[in-house]
Every structure is written in structure tokens, then in C-alpha cells.
Curated annotation (Swiss-Prot):
One of its GO terms (biological process) is translation. The modification 3-methylthioaspartic acid is found at residue 102. The keyword ATP-binding does not apply. This is Small ribosomal subunit protein uS12. The keyword ATP-binding does not apply. It comes from the Bacteria.
Amino acid sequence: MPTINQLVRKGRKSKVVKSDSPALNKGYNSFIKSQTNVSSPQKRGVCTRVGTMTPKKPNSALRKYARVRLTNQIEVTAYIPGIGHNLQEHSVVLIRGGRVKDLPGVRYHIVRGALDTAGVDGRMQGRSKYGTKRPKAAKK
């Protein structure tokens, strides 16, 4: 426990909170060609690479990912959720924050059903998370 005199001489240090998705906290001013501190919930970007990677132990799979160059000139790795996708190089995508626990370095998700990304086909439950339209009611 510090004395009052110690606190007067050297106050308490506040904890530094680090962002989980730092690329969303930067903007880009193309007129002066520099980054700005403008936060946004999602960002647009162009796929520079689409591929699969294997997760950490003890899981085993081929997880789909895309390397995305954002509008603020930062390049990030984003996870492609759902079964099947139509993304390839130069596809324009929307990313949101949210890491994938078993893929190191993947801190972002691609939003399905936005821009060039198609929704998941044949999905009936949790459709809003995968950009799937409501199926037409069957005729009797």
C-alpha cells in the first residue's frame, strides 16, 4: 500500500486497453496520404489471396480465409464463415471484427451477403449471420 506522499510524487498509472481489431480503428485520408484515427464497425477491402489453413491443436480442418487489403491501406487476414464461398482474388468484401480462436493471426470475419460475397446456399437457421435470404413459402 503506497503512502499519500508516494502517490503525490508519482500518481497511479491507468491501464492501457488494447483493441482486439486495430485495423478497424484507423482511417485513411487520401488527400494528405496519411492515416487518421477514425473508428468504424466494418471496413471494405479487396481480396489479395484466398486459401485454406489448418487450425491449432487439438482441432483439425481446412479453414477458409482471405487476405484483404482494406481501404485504409492495411492488409489483414479474415475468416470466411459458412459452407462454400464464391470469393477469389480481387473480390470486394466487407469485414467486421471477431477473431477465430483456433487460427493464429485471424482477427476479422468477412460479412456474408454483402458486396461481392454471396450468402450461404440452403441455410435455414441463423440465416442473418450468413447473408441468406428467407426461402419462399411452398405452395399447397
